[in-house]
Amino acid sequence: MMETTKRAEIDTTAPFRTVKEAVALFGERVLASQVYSNHLKVMHDEKWEDPSGIKIELQETRYDLKRAKEESIQMRNSLSCLKEELERTKQELQKLRVDPGVNETKLDETVFKTKFEVLVPRVDDEPIRSPRLRSMSEKRYVKFANPTGNNGSVFLERHPSMKKKEKKTKDKKKKSLIPLFIGGIFSKKKVLQ
C-alpha cells in the first residue's frame, strides 16, 4: 500500500508591512485590548475623574508657554543687538581698509593720550607714581631664623624614610648580581664525550 503524504504550505511572509496598517485594519482596541486593557481603563478614569487636576495642568502649561515666549523675545533682542554690533564693526573695518594711513595716526594719538598707572597704596594712603619707588614698595622679603651651630653651618640629614629606601636599593643590587653570576655558570651546555 502506498501512503500518500500531503504537504501543507505555510505562508511566511509578513502579514502587514507596517504597524500602522495593522492598526488601521483591526483598530487599536482589538490589538491592545489583551495587553493594556486594565492600564487603559485606569488612565481613562484618571483623566476624567479630577477636573481640578486638568485645570492645574492647564495653568502650568500656560506658565511654561509664557516663560518660553519671554525667553524667545529676549533671544531675539540679543540677536538683533549682536547683528547691529556686527554691522558697526564691519563698517569700521571697511573704513580702515579704505583709509589705512589716516586711521593709524588717530590710533597712535589715542595710544599716546592714554596713560596707564599702577597705584600702590602706601601707609599714609598716598599713591606712589615713580616707577623706581613703586618697584621697591612692591618687593617682598622673607627673613629666616638664625641657624643653630658653632660656625653657622647647618648639617641637613636625610629623612628616615629615605634612609630605608637607600638600604632597600643596596640590598636589591647585591641580590641581582648573584643570580646573574650563578645563572651564567650553570646555563652552559655540557659537552657529551
UniProtKB/Swiss-Prot annotation:
Where, if anywhere, are coiled coils annotated? 57-99
Q: Where is the composition biased (Basic residues)?
A: 161-174
Q: Which domain of life is it from?
A: Eukaryota
Keywords (A to Z) from UniProt: Coiled coil
Span list, region Disordered: 152-174
Give start-end of the signal peptide.
none
Give the UniProt family note.
Belongs to the WEB family.
* Protein known as: WEB family protein At1g75720
